[in-house]
Amino acid sequence: PLFKHLLDELQGQDVYVDTDSDMIFNDLKNKDVTCYKRNQKFIDLETDGDFKVSPVLLMIENFLDKYVTDENEVIVTPHVTSPFIKLSTMRDAAAYLDVFDSAQACTEHKEFTYFKGQPVNFNPDVVQKTQDLEPVVMGNGAFFIFTKKVFKENNNRVGKNPYFYPITFPESIEIDNDKDWELAERVYEE
């Protein structure tokens, strides 16, 4: 399972697992991680068609209130749907907290990019070389890094002065659909 792949990568770290799966909870009970059952109200919000946003911020707030006493402790939230993210990458990104208040994984794209029909990173009146374009940065859910203090001040994993840490393939694979799953399987098998 994906969660085991990530836990293997995080071996030796202080790891907390929030799950609604009895199988995962029971599998991790006697392991070197703190596993706790997801609050039913968060499960209900995930399936509530009237609740238009993810309850992830509520879940993080619950975790911080329950388990984190030091408001300056660095919190890293890797996601199991990014199975190829490396501990070394997250450590490198966390080093930026000396200058920035948070860090998020991202991918950089040097392509002619439009948003709502308008150019984002180029002048449409000038033919530029693709390699000369300003990269467009897209957030990737592989990880978010912040402190309890930053989260409480912003009610978000991303603070007011974030660093967007670029990751590349295969670490940037994020499994959101069947095609992503198939790609991850192919990469894993190689």
Task: Show the residue positions of the predicted features.
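Hydrophobic helical membrane-anchoring modules
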Residues: 165-166, 170-190
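Short beta-strand scaffold positions
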Residues: 18-19, 145, 175
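Generic beta-sheet signal
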Residues: 18, 38, 78, 105-106
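A short acidic, often aromatic-flanked loop/helix-cap motif at beta-alpha or helix-coil junctions
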Residues: 41-46, 110-113, 170-173
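N-terminal glycine-rich phosphate-binding loop and ensuing alpha1 helix
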Residues: 1-19
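Short phosphate-binding loop-to-helix
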Residues: 2, 22-76, 84-88, 92
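Conserved core of the sugar-phosphate nucleotidyltransferase
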Residues: 58-62, 71-74, 80-169
